[in-house]
C-alpha cells in the first residue's frame, strides 16, 4: 500500500488532557497506539523536537500503511494546533521505499508552543486505535503479498503460452521487416549513384543420351516385360497407403520440430 496516498480519515471526539508542562526540549517522547481489529498489541511512535526548526517535531516508527493523515489526526486529539507543513522524510528499508517499513515524518506547527504541549502530553494519552481514524481500513497481509510474489515469479501455463506466442510473433515480424529492408537497400543507389546488381546463376544444360548409350535404361534388353495387372493394381494401392503413412509421419515430426524450435528461441519468460 502506498503510504503517500490520501486516506479517508474519520473525525474522532477529542480527549481532554490537562497537565503542567515541565519538559526537557531534547527528551525523546513516545505516543501509544494500536492497529485495531485482531491487532491489539500496544505500539509506540517516538516524538522529539526538531533541533533545526523551533516550531517542528519529528515523529518516527510510523508503520508505512498508517499514513500521514492518521498521525496528524491522532496528535490533534490532545494538541489542537494549526499545522503549517507535514511530510514524510524517510523509511528504514534498505531501498528507502516509503510504502514499506517504518517511516519518519516532520510536522511543523504555526506556533512554537505547540511543540512543547505536544511533547508534554503525548505520553499521558492513548493508546489510540488506528482503525478509529480510518473509514475503510486496509492493512498489508503476508499471505496476500506472498501470493502476489508467487504469481509474479511463477506465471501460469496460459500466461507462459501467451508470452511465447507474443515473442515468436514479434520475432517473425522483425525478421520479415529486416528482409524487406535489406531488399530495399539493394534497389537504392549508393552515395555515388550506383545500384548493386546481382547476376543469377545459369541453370545447367541438360544432356541428351540415346537409349543405346545407357544400358540401365534398356539398351541391353529391349524385350517388354509382361506385367500381371492384378498384382500391379494391388501394388499401386499398397504403395499409395505406405506413402500416405510416411507423409502423415513426416507431418507429425515437422509439427513437433516446429514446436521445439519455438520453445528454444532465446525465450526468457521471467
Swiss-Prot record:
GO terms for cellular component: CURI complex; UTP-C complex. It comes from Caenorhabditis elegans. One of its GO terms (biological process) is rRNA processing. It holds the Pfam family RRP7. Keywords: Coiled coil. Signal peptide: none annotated. CDD domains: RRP7_Rrp7A. This is Ribosomal RNA-processing protein 7 homolog. Belongs to the RRP7 family. Residues 233-268 form a coiled coil.
Amino acid at each position: 500500500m502506498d503510504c503517500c496516498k490520501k486516506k479517508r480519515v474519520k473525525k474522532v471526539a477529542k480527549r481532554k488532557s490537562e497537565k503542567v508542562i515541565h519538559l526537557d526540549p531534547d527528551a525523546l517522547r513516545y505516543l501509544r497506539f494500536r492497529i485495531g481489529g485482531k491487532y491489539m498489541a500496544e505500539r509506540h511512535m517516538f516524538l522529539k523536537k526538531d533541533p533545526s526548526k523551533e516550531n517542528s517535531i519529528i515523529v518516527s516508527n510510523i508503520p508505512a500503511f498508517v499514513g500521514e493523515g492518521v498521525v496528524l489526526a491522532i496528535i490533534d486529539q490532545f494538541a489542537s494546533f494549526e499545522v503549517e507543513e507535514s511530510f514524510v522524510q524517510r523509511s528504514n528499508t534498505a531501498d528507502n521505499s516509503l510504502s514499506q517499513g517504518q517511516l519518519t515524518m516532520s510536522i511543523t506547527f504555526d506556533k512554537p508552543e505547540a511543540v512543547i504541549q505536544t511533547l508534554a502530553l503525548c505520553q499521558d494519552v492513548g493508546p489510540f486505535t488506528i482503525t478509529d481514524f480510518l473509514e475503510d481500513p486496509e492493512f498489508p497481509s503476508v499471505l496476500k503479498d506472498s501470493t502476489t510474489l508467487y504469481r509474479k515469479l511463477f506465471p501460469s501455463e496460459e500466461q507462459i503460452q501467451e508470452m511465447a506466442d507474443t515473442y515468436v510473433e514479434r520475432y517473425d515480424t522483425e525478421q520479415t521487416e529486416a528482409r524487406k529492408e535489406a531488399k530495399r537497400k539493394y534497389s537504392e543507389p549508393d552515395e555515388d549513384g550506383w545500384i548493386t546488381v546481382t547476376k543469377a546463376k545459369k541453370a545447367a544444360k541438360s544432356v541428351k543420351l540415346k537409349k543405346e548409350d545407357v544400358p540401365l535404361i534398356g539398351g541391353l534388353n529391349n524385350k517388354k516385360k509382361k506385367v500381371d495387372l492384378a498384382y500391379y493394381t494391388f501394388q499401386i494401392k499398397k504403395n499409395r497407403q505406405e506413402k500416405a503413412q510416411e507423409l502423415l509421419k513426416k507431418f507429425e515430426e515437422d509439427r513437433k520440430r516446429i514446436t521445439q524450435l519455438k520453445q528454444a528461441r532465446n525465450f526468457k519468460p521471467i
